[in-house]
Amino acid sequence: MLKVHSDRSLYFEQQYINTKKYIVSFVDEAYKLNPGMEVLEIGCGEGGVLKAFIDAGMTGVGVDLHTYKFDLAVQFLDEYIKDGRITLINKDIYSPELQKQFNERFDLIILKDTLEHIFDQEKLIGYLRGFLKDNGMMFLAFPPWNMPFGGHQQMCSSKFLSYMPYYHLLPTSLYKILLKAFKEDKQLIEELLDIKQTQISLQRYKRIVKEKGFRTVREQLYFIIPNYEIKFNMKPRRLNKFIGTIPYLRDFVTTTIYSLIQKQKVTNT
């Protein structure tokens, strides 16, 4: 397991630095972030991503079901919570209370490394559309399932498994046998098998975006993910544009997609 996955304060700082340097500018260049705008992050974890957007002048809400990560966010974002710039909520995003409270409220919604963990991604993206103001934006970043570490195997305690690419593409039965053979924790194995079920490809994501009433405003595919700059001192590299046009093949060499999509008005015909 990489140290960043066990040291949550380090993970928080790395998320903050990466978001401030790469993601805030990615959004701001296409959708000007102004003081008074409100942002919602789904699966906010420890809050490093959300903090970067608040430092850009926004106010925000972070929602996470994971109690341990939520408690860390409360600790790490204490000053922001006290001065009213951030509200943290430890609830299911589908709760009727939040649905009413969040209706057409936000200028921007963020799902950073969250979508690939969600069952029924079509339902979630369509549901979150109702939380956006007219012409509001949603930023999503996720690793396509077929990329070298699309199974999140870097979380494995075995150094060999954490650095070995593509084996998450094995049939489920063989994948499970391999994880057990290296004595991975039962809870981690269950989490990795869940990710195998919730896998998402670039093709399916693009279809969902269109079907759920959004248009793509900006998109960037990365060969070397920006996170690796601070983790491994590797400079980010964008995916070759030609390879990026080839369906299926691009999923095997795209480490992450940055996607900014806009809510479209529904027209009655």
Range-by-range predicted roles:
Residues M1-E104, L108, F252-T269:
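Conserved N-terminal segment of class I S-adenosyl-L-methionine
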Residues Y11, E97, D120, L161-S162:
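Poly-acidic low-complexity segments
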Residues H117:
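Histidine-centered divalent metal-coordination motifs
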Residues K51, L72, D120-Q121, F149-G151:
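Short glycine-/acidic-enriched loop or helix-start segments at secondary-structure transitions
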